[in-house]
Amino acid sequence: MALLMTCFVIVFAASQPCQTPDDLVAAASPGHIMIGGLFAIHEKILSSEEPRKPEIQKCASFEIPTFLQTLAMIHSIEMINNSTLLSGVKLGYEIYDTCTDITVAMAAALRCVSKFNSSREIVEFKCDYSNYVPRVKAVIGAGYSEISMAVSRTLSLQLMPQVSYESTAETLSDKIQFPSFLRSVSSDFYQTKAMAHLIQKSGWIIGILTTDDDYGLNTLAVQTAANNVCIAFREALPAFRSDITIEVRINQTLERTIAEAKVNVIVVFLSQFHVFNLFSKAIERNINKIWIVSSWSTSTIATIPDVKRIGKVVGFTFRRGNVSSFQSFLQNLCVFPSDNNKPLNEHAMLSACAHAKDSDLSQCVSNCSQGTLATKDSERNFFLRTDFLWDYTELGLVHSIQLAVLALSYAIQDLQADFQPWELLAVLKNVTFMEGWSSFHFYAHGAMNTGYNIVLWREINGHMSIKMAQYDLKNDVFIVTNQETKNEHRNLKKIQSKFFKECSSGQMKKTTKSQHTCCYECVTCPENHYSNQTDTDHYLLYNNETHWAPVGSTMCFEKEMEYLDSLAILLLALSLLGILFVLAIGIIFTRNLNTPVVKSSGELMVRYVILFCHFLNFAGTGFFIREPQSFTCKTRQTLICMSFTLCISYILMKSLKILLAFSSKLQNFLKCFYKPIPIIFTCTGIVVVCTLLIFAAPAVGQNVSLPRVIIFECEEGSILAFGSMLGYAAILAFMCFICAFKGRKFPENYNEAKFITFGMLIYFIAWITFIPIYTFGKYMLVVEIIIILISNYGICCMFFPKCYVILSKQETNTKSVFLKMIYSYSPHSAGSLAMSHSNITITNRTSAGGSAVQQKSRDLQLQGFAHICRENAMCRTKALPPKRISSI
């Protein structure tokens, strides 16, 4: 066997030089409809030097796997001709050898598009090839993507269908550049997607070996990036074997592979030639890795000696079909003298020389090439040695060639008349046919819905492969058929190919600055993030409105619902204490109604209304502490605001009533506003605001902004309405503060201006502090309750001095003491009034006439002090000395 293989690849096994256009044809058979075929039957062109003449080079190094592919096309066409699919129509073929060279392939493409039945083999130039009749109607091939691209640009000029059986480059899916290109296999997009899927699920860090052309390089990069596959290194080998640096680059690649000791998985996206040389040298260096090999390389692996020493090889192969008839075809293969099949004759020649010694090998090949073998057996068929051919058959490619021939045949069946290639292309794109139990068709981008098989190259009973899974293109999943292959698939995923130990649950991978993009460190998940998987590179998401997670958590927790806090006990205690104070003040005032201190506080209704408002303010804080309900949510703010407003209004009325007696300007100013329209407008606005706050506000809501709890709280509704109520109360408080401040010089036992001023200052400070705080947070309501308590206690201060006098200084709570205070204040007040009267008299004397306004002001001033006396029950006219009364 080794001698036979040596004979197949020696330089003497070269094709004949091209003398005439017919010499370019490797195999041919006539028919009504001709199909072209492009196959790399020879590995390379013979000359490695720069060409000096525009002539087609000789080919060298006979390739058995590709030779078998040409036989697969011939067999498939014969199967169609022997069937009833194309009744009365015979398919013919012309197969060309591309020699793995673009120039030779272009020469074959030119012959395919040359004019039919033309003795000169010319390609006519036309602006419109709609009615042009070329030599062939369609082309099957080529194998290499680079060659298919070059050929497709020529065939696309006439929109001649080109169906490749092996070209998988994703670039060929571009229908703008390659409008007539189709393929009976899936594109690299799906193959690389399947590879990236397998690698990502296994968590491997990989190395990538590719060629420096379009084959898989760009698509693989896109898919690995999309699946977050970590690439430790990447090496690119020269695409063409004629490159003199290829051996050096292979050695450098293997050295890099050895240096990356922790990278145990290598993805190989190379051609058969590259894989054969790479693996052969890797076996010599005892490199043991996991090799993931693309579909182009799988047929080569079985031919590599001692390939099992290289480690595990996982191959992606084209999905296989029923090719049993082709096996029978090979077993009965023979050479007919009349056959126009140069590859078959070359195979027969090399088979005949397999027994020759090295010294006689050259002479044997020379004799065979002169046709002595054919003349010797011209009377009978020459049966070939075919016992080894099946081992070199790539079943997936054979099936792809069968599908290509079938697709063309079904498209021709739909036409069944004289047609042009572009008409065949239109039908071919939409053809659907059955092969076995499967239905096949072309996608819009030109690939067929075939898929891939994943095989593990391992020797079992003399065979070098075992199917592990099938890749489903549509659902992006691996389908495992039996338990044995499932175990193999599971064991494959257990292989370690990582730089670091995997991160535990509650951690994630974070990329570090290193020469490798895959280096990472394990970092603990921060608060409100979690990870329940090992070796993950991202945090898991959850609904942070309803759940939370601590630092380094492996799971998330549901937020607890809260509406009470231990601080509420303290606030309730302060509220109850305030209620007790109000009740105590009410009791004290009730028991001392007829004392001067109580009477000096104002009218009876005013006193009790103010105390009742304080009571409501303290009691209203309870609506903020209990569980939120619709009624409490809608009424609590309104209750507090109205209580404060009513309380401050009565205090303002009390202060303003006295102040008016001494200010004529204030009386004139208030006359402008003391009219029905302003009063009705203001009161109506207050009612509307309160109504909106009660009925238009949402009742109960949830505050989900806190990290670990959900606050069950009331929603305040319209901020504008709420602010309007607070603003109105603030305006009243400010007016009350001004009036109290202006009346601070009145008799102390009668006047409460100092304490009202103090209470209003506390009120302002508290609510001004509340504005920036009342925005957000768990303790927002706590702050509001504290502000309410502080401001309410501050206003209550106006009652504390009177209670102190009633309880502790009863000797000052007498009529005589109050009369004495009035008497001591009266000379000062009367003197001021007399001085004012004198000034008015002097002014009147110097003026031409008197002013009625000045006279009225003087009368008001005289009445002011009398009003003070009337407010006090103890102030009587008979108690005053006659001189002081007459002086006023």
Curated annotation (Swiss-Prot):
| GO MF, one example | G protein-coupled receptor activity
What biological-process GO terms show up in the record?
regulation of testosterone biosynthetic process
Q: Which residues lie on this side of the membrane: Extracellular?
A: 16-568, 626-641, 698-718, 776-779
Which superkingdom heads the taxonomic lineage of this protein's source? Eukaryota
Q: Where in the cell is it found?
A: Cell membrane
InterPro entries noted in UniProt: ANF_lig-bd_rcpt, GPCR_3, GPCR_3_9-Cys_dom, GPCR_3_9-Cys_sf, GPCR_3_C, GPCR_3_Ca_sens_rcpt-rel, GPCR_3_vmron_rcpt_2, Peripla_BP_I
Major subcellular location class = membrane
Which ranges sit in the Cytoplasmic compartment? 590-604, 663-676, 740-754, 801-888
Specify the protein's topology with respect to the membrane. Multi-pass membrane protein
- Which Pfam families does the record associate with it? 7tm_3 (PF00003), ANF_receptor (PF01094), NCD3G (PF07562)
Segments spanning the bilayer are: 569-589, 605-625, 642-662, 677-697, 719-739, 755-775, 780-800
Q: Which UniProt keywords apply?
A: Cell membrane, Disulfide bond, G-protein coupled receptor, Glycoprotein, Membrane, Receptor, Signal, Transducer, Transmembrane, Transmembrane helix
Regarding protein family, the annotation reads: Belongs to the G-protein coupled receptor 3 family.
Protein name, per record: G-protein coupled receptor family C group 6 member A
Q: Organism source for this protein?
A: Bos taurus (Bovine)
Source taxonomy:
Eukaryota, Metazoa, Chordata, Craniata, Vertebrata
Q: What gene is this protein translated from? A: GPRC6A
